[in-house]
C-alpha cells in the first residue's frame, strides 16, 4: 500500500506552566508535524519537538529537512517498507533527530492503522502500564513544595525534581520535599549535567535517608568518564540522558564497567521509534534498565514513546509528562492517565484522534 500524500507544518504550543532547568526557562515550544496518507485513505501522524540545547537542532532546521527530504523519502513508497525508510533516515538525516522522529512516528502510526492494530501490538507488547513521574522545574523550596502537593493531590505518585544549581541547596530541597510528601511518594532527581563527581557523592550522601529513586545525568556529557570516580552503587542509580542520543552511544555506554545503570531514551534525541528500539535492545542485552523520557511534546510523540516503552522488556521507568502542561494540542487520546499510571487504549495506531481535519 503506497504512501500518496505527505504534509508537514509547525505550530507554537504555549505551556500553561513555564519552568526552569539548569540552563534556561521554558515558556513555549514549537512542534513540527508530519501527516501521511496511503492510497486507501489510511493516514498517520507524527510530531517532533527539536531541542537545540541538547541536539543542536532548531525548528528552522527541522522545517528545512522536511522541505528538502520528506516527499523524496516517502511518496510512492510502500508503507510495508517503513523500517527501511527509518533506517535510511538514520544515515542521511542524522543531524535532525526531531524531524526524523516526526516522519518515523507518522510511518509507525500509518502502518499500525493500516493493520488495524494498536502500535504496541505491532511492536510486541511486554507491559500493560507504568507509573509516570511528573516534573518540577528549578524553583524555590516553597514553590517546589506547593507544586509537589498539587501533583500528589492530582494522583501522581512519582515526582521528578530538577536540580543542579547548588548541591547544598539541592540536598535541603530533597529533605524538605520528602518531609512534605511522606514516604509513599517516589522522588527522582534530574541534575541536568549540573554536578561534578564530588558534588554527586555529596548529594548522594546528603540524601541517603530520603530514598531518592535515581539521579538523571548528574555530570556534563563530556565528563562521562568521571562517573568512574563514584561508587558502583551510585552509578547503578544514575541515568544517562544527554550522554545518550543514538544507538552508537548506547553501545559505547554498554561497555563494562557500566557508567550508568539506566538509559533515558527520548524519541527527540534518538530520531524516532526505530532507533529507540535499537537502543532498547542494547540495554536489554546489557542488563541496563530503561527509562523513557521526553521534551515538551504533543500527545502524538508522547503516545509513540509510550507504545514503544510498553513493547520493551527492559523498560522500568516512565517520565512521559511532556504534553500535560500544553495549553493546546492537535489531537486527543493516544494514552490514558489514571492514578498516575500511563497505558494505551485498544484504538488502532497511536490511538490519537485529530481535533481538526488535516487538509493535504
Short names for language-model regions:
Residues 186-196, 237-246:
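Extended hydrophobic secondary-structure segments
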Residues 1-187, 192-194, 201, 205-208, ...:
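N-terminal capping/lid subdomain adjacent to the active-site entrance of alpha/beta enzymes
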Residues 196, 211-212:
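Conserved N-terminal glycine/acidic-rich loop preference
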Residues 33, 129-133, 157-160, 184-188, ...:
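Structural preference for beta-strand elements that scaffold enzyme active sites
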Residues 211, 222-239, 244-341, 345:
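Shared catalytic-loop signature of beta/alpha-barrel
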Residues 35, 110-111, 136, 212, ...:
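A broad, low-amplitude sensor of folded, mature protein cores
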Residues 100, 136, 162-166, 192-193, ...:
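Glycine- and other small-residue-rich loops at beta-strand/loop junctions that grip anionic moieties
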Residues 141-143, 165-181, 196-199, 219-231, ...:
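Active-site-adjacent beta->alpha loops and helix N-cap segments on the catalytic face
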